[in-house]
């Protein structure tokens, strides 16, 4: 067991994910901040400065022109007046979550805690509450590992558009409020990136050395203040230039500050617990990079079992509250979770909060349905490990970055996990009253089969096929689980 990490690849590649993370399987994320105020979804702080986007048009009509009413003014409107982290944490625990992720800062450079490095924070502006401290208190009461997400690394180049102006109409040529010298500490002195929108906010990470140093100071402040069990970076390990699964050889110098942050996270955990219980999540899919922590795959999955745990983050709808965006059905969320854990993954689900801090009735319904499923099937989730195969059947989830389509499962589709000598088989498409054929037990005599929530069920095993008869009424709305010994 490593008892101290140096800020080098050689040292940090000795990392191994802690037991609690391997066992937890499911967490909930509060991806929440002042961008929830307009209730118009993700990247509002950016798109409101891009002439012609729906969010720009909404902002113009609802708040006024961004030269007069900018994002700093949106931040002042955020009050979080009905935010009750204790009751929300209780709801999330009841729904099956076994860790809590909270947002320290998004690309909008607004901090959700009492920062000494950034005056634009939730104690000084808007809610006048230390959002992260309140969340941590609630998580600690329940014994839930507590995580923080930082999206700061991309902010400097992502927010170049606040330095622009309209090209057409009555405000053509009038600078947006991001040009105000009095607010450069918030909007960034990022003129070097120009003002044009490149579409994908490229480059994701700036080369600006002053901002990179500032990023490290801020992340260090987050770690020292909250001693998180998880730290999530929205991007690759800073400040790498590659994304997803590109194969270029990494330049160690580019990652120097990122490695310092990861080492501090782990060494803080060792000092607190006598061992490292912390998890670092980032999105570079090259093993030589992600082996310093745990690979995160945003809104997508993997085609097969990965030897070490991996992580998916997803949401019930948009990333920030959006009155226009439909939510996933509970069944889709549960089926995603089952497919992920069968491949050694862990799933983080963003439950959207309105600007006042509450969740809406649809989100509450989703939590209730997930909780009902966990009440029956939790033993097939917590503490399990992948089996020798992840499943049976021809249906596969669509593997495409940032794409999540509901999978149409058939009666032959099964997903497996194992624990304590039992194999759990999730029935992805089977209906009540059917007989299910499982072909992965040809060389393994079966002594008993139990349907979780219903009890023992009839089965036969011959000619390499385990045939299980299901009752007319199944206990769960989807992904019913067999316990096979």
Walk through the language-model features, giving the residues of each.
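Mature catalytic domains of secreted/periplasmic carbohydrate-active enzymes
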Residues: 2-485
């Amino acid at each position: 067991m490593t008892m101290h990490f140096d800020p080098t690849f050689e040292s940090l590649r000795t990392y191994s994910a802690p037991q609690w993370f391997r066992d937890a399987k499911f967490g909930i994320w509060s991806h929440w901040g002042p961008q929830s105020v307009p209730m118009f979804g993700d990247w509002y702080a950016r798109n409101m400065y891009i002439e012609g986007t729906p969010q720009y048009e909404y902002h113009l009509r609802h708040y006024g022109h961004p030269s007069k009413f900018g994002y700093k003014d949106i931040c002042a409107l955020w009050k979080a007046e009905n935010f009750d982290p204790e009751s929300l944490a209780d709801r999330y625990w009841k729904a099956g979550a076994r860790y809590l992720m909270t947002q320290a800062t998004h690309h909008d450079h607004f901090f959700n805690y009492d920062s000494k490095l950034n005056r634009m924070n939730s104690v000084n502006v808007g809610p006048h509450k230390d959002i992260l401290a309140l969340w941590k208190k609630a998580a600690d009461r329940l014994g839930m590992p507590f995580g923080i997400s930082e999206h700061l690394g991309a902010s400097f180049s992502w927010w170049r558009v606040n330095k622009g102006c309209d090209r057409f109409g009555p405000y053509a040529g009038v600078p947006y409020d991001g040009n105000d010298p009095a607010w450069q500490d918030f909007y960034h002195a990022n003129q070097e990136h120009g003002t044009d929108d490149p579409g994908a906010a490229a480059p994701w990470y700036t080369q600006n050395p002053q901002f990179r140093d500032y990023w490290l100071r801020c992340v260090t402040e987050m770690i020292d203040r909250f001693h998180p069990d998880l730290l999530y970076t929205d991007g690759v390990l800073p400040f790498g230039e590659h994304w997803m699964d590109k194969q270029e050889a990494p330049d160690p110098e580019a990652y120097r500050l990122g490695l310092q942050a990861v080492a501090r996270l782990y060494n803080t955990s060792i000092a607190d617990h006598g061992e490292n219980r912390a998890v670092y999540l980032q999105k570079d899919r090259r093993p030589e990079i992600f082996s310093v922590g745990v690979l995160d795959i945003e809104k997508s999955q993997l085609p097969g079992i990965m030897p070490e745990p991996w992580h998916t983050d997803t949401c019930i709808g948009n990333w920030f509250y959006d009155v226009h965006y439909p939510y996933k059905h509970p069944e889709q969320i549960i089926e995603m979770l089952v497919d992920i854990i069968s491949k050694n993954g862990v799933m983080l689900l963003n439950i959207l909060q309105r600007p006042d801090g509450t969740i809406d009735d649809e989100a509450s319904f989703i939590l209730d349905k997930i909780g009902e499923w966990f009440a029956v099937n939790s033993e097939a989730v917590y503490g399990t490990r992948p089996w020798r195969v992840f499943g049976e059947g021809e249906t596969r989830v669509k593997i495409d970055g940032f794409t999540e389509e509901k999978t149409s499962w058939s009666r032959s589709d099964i997903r497996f996990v194992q624990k304590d000598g039992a194999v759990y088989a999730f029935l992805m498409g089977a209906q009540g009253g059917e007989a299910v054929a499982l072909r992965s037990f040809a060389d393994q005599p079966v002594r008993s089969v139990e349907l979780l929530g219903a009890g023992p069920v009839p089965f036969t095993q011959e000619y390499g096929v385990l045939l299980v008869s299901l009752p007319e009424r199944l206990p769960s709305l989807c992904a019913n689980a067999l316990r096979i010994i």
